[in-house]
Amino acid sequence: MRLEQKIAIVTGAAKGLGGAMAQLFAREGAKVIAVDMAPLTYECENVEYYSLNVTDSQACKALTDYAKEKYGKIDILVNNAGITRDAMTRKMTDEMWDLVIDINLKGVFNLTRYVGPLMEEMGGGSIINIASVVGEYGNIGQANYAASKAGVIGLTKTWAKEFARKGVPVRCNAIAPGYIMTDMMKTVPEDLLKKFAGLTMLGRLGQPEEIAKAALFLASDDASYVTGHVLSVNGGMRL
């Protein structure tokens, strides 16, 4: 098993991408703290639910302290929690902008500001930030989401430099998914799904498990020489 005896925190883990990652990590031997405001939609051995709002900095510190006290370390952090509130810029409200930035960007900062230094103290670790193809290329009607995910990419590259500067192997990478068949996508009309699939070289949408497998690689020792990288998992959307 590739994550045996590893301790992992996965945010936004109630379902979807986060749920797929939490369950795969557990099957690969990790003990997983699955973080979300909503209860988990699955049961999985070695996955522990922890209720948390990532916009609350002190709650993020409390989670870090809890994991350290219970397990003595944190090996893997996946910052996956995120939302969308789409609108054209001229119609986007302050509330829509602030909520997306607070959860998608500030939430990533809030948890990593505590977990990253702990990983340095403990001798290493892997931080994986879930970005998006929208953060790389932008998208009409998603100014807030695009800004938040572009910010996540910037944080990833900054932390890859900051947390490794003392010679401690704390790696920080991002995954930029394309169109993935999550519960949110299942509400999209069939004709649009076909259009999205046609934008890829592989002619289909991705599955949550495919993002989870990418995260497993970055979390494992197989990626021991990979840091500061943005791994695009999008079926060849932007070739």
What are these regions (language model features)?
Residues 52-62, 94, 209-210:
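The beta1-alpha1 cofactor-binding region of Rossmann-like NAD(H)/NADP(H)-dependent oxidoreductases
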Residues 88-89, 93-101, 185, 196:
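Substrate-binding pocket helix/loop in short-chain dehydrogenase/reductase
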Residues 112, 148, 156:
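Active-site helix of classical SDR
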Residues 117, 161-165, 224:
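Alpha-helical segment proximal to the catalytic Tyr-Lys
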Residues 132:
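Residue(s) in the substrate-gating loop at a strand-loop-helix junction
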Residues 137, 216, 227-239:
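Short C-terminal tail/terminal secondary-structure segment
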Residues 164, 169-171, 226-228:
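Short, small/polar-rich loop/turn modules that mediate ligand/substrate recognition or access, typified
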